[in-house]
């Protein structure tokens, strides 16, 4: 009990500077932004267990799903950070996907002094002893990467991607988003920062020694405070000089002959260039080191399979959990009606569909991403307590529920029997979210009139009309009793004919009109009351089901 009280006590942010807390309540995110890139923002965070500051890297899921290149870089970075453990490679703690805020979060160690480029520009008067120490640490990290089987090529070594803790001169290699595992003798793709790219990179035929060339350019930047080839105005000019063997103008500014000699060793043609291990033996260099940490068991980011759908989906998976195993949606059988919940999040209409199938629980959430696409999250808890999440964009023009469902079943390695089930979930959600949505599969039997606001009025009007007809018939019987003559069709017909021949008085016509109005009012009142009773019944039913479900879901979260 004491432990649970402590945990609940830290769920609320401790101060206004805290914007977010991770699912394990271990890490907190502050307002302070310490770095920002094209797709990633880095905030200062804090590890409340170890009492240390951390870097909280955050990427918006919708941004990733619309840029396959950024998504691939993220997967590459997470995969490599998790697999690499070395004193000169940035330390990885944890990663997870936040379904609610639609972000990918990666916790790494914090470098209080920022990148080596920032640090060097801030501290211009630094003894060469310190520069040599930094160089040795970078090479030690590269040696580790290049010694993997198969070797890992960073492909974007530069001072912007090397980080430092200035209080004790600790340097580590980071930003592994462009790194690649060299499964063949030579890599082929052209990628990196032009100012730091080796000539062979432009020829699309290179190996790990391309990182050594980039390291040489880092050394040049550290001693001259200039980006290599800053005299060039664009990438084309840089390429022309590099391919022609022309060195950057800043190399002529290096006054120390030992430094010049060392940099030139790194910039030699690939066939003559020394490896990181060989350069570490150079008397020019020095040494330093540090320790590591172990990650928490948070839901894991999972690599999708190859294919067009894999390029626009993001998946995570959590380990089996005994509490997940006991989760119940309070649904009695496989063929039950799905629970549909409508909410409004900051002006955006959100729909959630929940349904059970043979011990597995499916929750599909969706909201309009823009006028052409819908952002969807499918969460599956299986009978063993394993939780899987898949985020994806549904394009209204080109996608169908069946096609997307088939792709998802393949990605999640589910049985083909789930294709129709998930397709029904998707179309039920879209019917409730998008006006006049044309379904791909039959879902009329699954849509309840009162389950969501978007379709509530249309379905409710239909139900009310039927109820109204029933009430009208009942009222006609109750308030317009038949005479004995009316019971006999022949007599009734004769009576009607006779009445038609008689000129009715104005008073009688007015009396009939008033009676008709009164009856219509009664019918309208009962129709409205019936609608209200139906609405209250559905609200009470949904509230009860949701209360039981949310209680179980909180245990999973």
Curated annotation (Swiss-Prot):
Species of origin: Arabidopsis thaliana (Mouse-ear cress)
Amino-acid positions noted as binding ATP in the UniProt annotation, renumbered to this chain: 108-111, 158
Location of the region described as Disordered in the Swiss-Prot/TrEMBL record: 451-517
Gene: WNK7
Protein's recorded name: Probable serine/threonine-protein kinase WNK7
Disulfide bonds: none
This enzyme's EC code(s): 2.7.11.1
Domain Protein kinase: 28-285
Function, as annotated: May regulate flowering time by modulating the photoperiod pathway.
Family annotation (SUPFAM superfamilies): Protein kinase-like (PK-like) (SSF56112)
Enzyme category, top tier: transferase
CDD domains: STKc_WNK
Biased composition (Polar residues): 451-477
Gene3D superfamilies: Phosphatidylinositol 3-kinase Catalytic Subunit, Chain A, domain 1, Phosphorylase Kinase, domain 1, Transferase(Phosphotransferase) domain 1
Annotated family: Belongs to the protein kinase superfamily. Ser/Thr protein kinase family. WNK subfamily.
Keyword Kinase among UniProt keywords: yes
Residues the record lists as Phosphoserine modifications: 505
List of catalytic residues: 175 (proton acceptor)
Catalytically driven reaction(s): L-seryl-[protein] + ATP = O-phospho-L-seryl-[protein] + ADP + H(+); L-threonyl-[protein] + ATP = O-phospho-L-threonyl-[protein] + ADP + H(+)
Keywords, alphabetical: ATP-binding, Kinase, Nucleotide-binding, Phosphoprotein, Serine/threonine-protein kinase, Transferase
Molecular function via GO: ATP binding; protein kinase activity; protein serine kinase activity; protein serine/threonine kinase activity
A GO biological-process term: protein phosphorylation
